[in-house]
Amino acid sequence: SPNNRMPVIVDHDNQIDGVPLSVFESGAILMYLGEKAGKFFPQSSPHRERVLEWLFWQVGGLGPMAGQVSHFVNYAPNFPGDHSYSEERYKNEYDRLLGVMDRILSERNYLAGDYSIADIASFPWITAYKRYEVDLDVFSNVRRWFDDIKSRPAVRKGIEVGKDCLLYT
């Protein structure tokens, strides 16, 4: 990755000038894999655009705000200074974003209608809600969505693989 950060994948089956293709950043990876596999990423309008809206909403909003909440709730207290403004600001924004999810999920089962890369991208940012000091039951539709995705066999398998290093609820 030019950013020297994870995630990145390398596809040896797809090469550019004899060099395996590398794809970095979560959203780009999910789009690439969705297109390659022909799953969870519609190929036609308007469904594709709906998935892209929610994928970019996660990449630009939910993920960064959850990361900030996690930092100020779990790590900043280990450093001197008053971090209460920052913690409150990011907790409020994370709650606002959960409210956005809750409203849209009152109308449909998944963010873009059918289960998609938008849900795959968003799910990890909800899994640590207890660490963020959030009562997920306040957002009943998000809770239903979360429980539904968490019960999917492939998701269960992934959680099991990472159970020793992840903080899933």
What feature does the model see in each segment?
Residues G158:
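Charged phosphate-binding loop/patch that engages nucleotide di/tri-phosphates or the phosphate backbone
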Residues V161-G162:
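Exported/periplasmic ABC-transporter solute-binding proteins
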Residues A28, P153-A154:
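Alpha-helix/helix-capping structural signal
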Residues Q58-P153:
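GST-like fold's C-terminal all-alpha helical module
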Residues S1-E88, N92, D102:
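GST-like domain detector, emphasizing the conserved glutathione-binding G-site
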Residues Y168-T169:
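Conserved small/polar residues in nucleotide/adenosyl-binding loops
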